[in-house]
Amino acid sequence: MARVCQVTGKKPMVGNNVSHANNKTKRRFLPNLQNRKFWVESENRWVSLRITNAALRTIDKNGIDAVLADLRASGEKI
């Protein structure tokens, strides 16, 4: 399973570990992904999403129905 947020599309990014001696080695910054189930009143069912905490805040702000409508408009199968 890819480490990609279903709502925001955030993916792992690449950067450097930097030691005290300023040696640099490659590392990955992973998104803070959470598996969450949401009750969708309009569909009378639970919907499972793999989302970041930033997406969770977006759902709190806009509502799950609006977020699901955007996902379906972009072609995501929910």
From Swiss-Prot:
GO terms for cellular component: cytosolic large ribosomal subunit. InterPro entries: Ribosomal_bL28, Ribosomal_bL28/bL31-like_sf, Ribosomal_bL28_bact-type, Ribosomal_bL28_sf. The keyword Plastid does not apply. Keywords: Ribonucleoprotein, Ribosomal protein. GO terms for molecular function: structural constituent of ribosome. It holds the Pfam family Ribosomal_L28. GO terms for biological process: translation. Coiled coil: none annotated. The keyword Membrane does not apply. HAMAP family: Ribosomal_bL28. NCBIfam families: L28. Belongs to the bacterial ribosomal protein bL28 family. This is Large ribosomal subunit protein bL28. It comes from Methylobacillus flagellatus (strain ATCC 51484 / DSM 6875 / VKM B-1610 / KT). The gene is rpmB.
